[in-house]
Design a protein with these regions (language model features):
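Active-site catalytic motif of lipid deacylating hydrolases and related acyltransferases
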Residues: 1-37, 157
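Active-site signature of alpha/beta-hydrolase-fold catalytic machinery across serine-
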Residues: 4, 55, 59
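A generic structural signal for well-ordered alpha-helical segments
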Residues: 9, 35, 56-57, 143-144
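Glycine-rich phosphate-binding loop signature in dinucleotide/nucleotide-binding domains
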Residues: 36-39, 179
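Residue in the alpha/beta-hydrolase core beta-strand immediately N-terminal to the catalytic nucleophile
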Residues: 41-44, 63-65
Length: 182
């Protein structure tokens, strides 16, 4: 997804694609540090990244595009306790991740407060993009309880390069144009 976004915006926008820590509190701190340093126009995340982006967007006052947001990470993680590998190659070459109870507890803590900063003002500043064939995350109804703009694309949970270029990139560009004076 990161490479496809970089290609889609080549010459028009800088796309930052950090390898985030597994633990969500550390990941939020890292994203916040990047935001403070780089001043991006938009946050964009998929799945767990969308979970993090929607929590941080109103705090840092930046619009966000959430791709297939997974708002109940604890449910997902409880079924996957143990050692796994990241789907995409990481810059540090560490492909190993371990899901354990402390990680699940940290996500549970954040899940309980994830919508606390969602204000009426932000209902139009956070957009959701949902794959019609997503077999993992089905959170469009929950999204619409908090936000107004939901879009659908004919894909699954993890978008292909073509889906990123056809759906994610155009919506991100539209958001950046809409909120450019923000």
């Amino acid at each position: 997804m990161a490479l496809a976004l970089k290609e889609a915006f080549e010459g028009t926008a800088v796309v930052l694609t950090p390898d985030l820590p597994l633990h969500p509190k550390e990941a939020l701190k890292e994203i916040r540090s990047i935001v403070d340093r780089e001043h991006p126009d938009l946050l964009l995340g998929n799945s767990c990244g969308a979970f993090l982006a929607q929590m941080l967007a109103p705090v840092v006052d930046i619009p966000a595009l959430l791709g297939n947001p997974y708002f109940k990470m604890t449910e997902f993680l409880k079924e996957r306790i143990g050692e796994h590998e990241y789907k995409a190659p990481r810059r540090d070459s560490n492909q190993r991740l371990v899901i354990e109870e402390t990680l699940i507890e940290e996500f549970a803590e954040l899940e309980s407060i994830q919508f606390d900063n969602c204000t009426p003002y932000y209902k139009d500043m956070v957009w959701g993009l949902f794959g019609e064939h997503d077999a993992i995350a089905h959170f469009c109804p929950l999204f619409l309880e908090h936000y107004n703009n939901a879009f659908h694309f004919p894909g699954g949970h993890t978008p292909t390069e073509q889906e990123v270029k056809a759906w994610y990139a155009p919506l991100a560009a539209k958001m950046m144009m809409k909120f450019e004076d923000f």
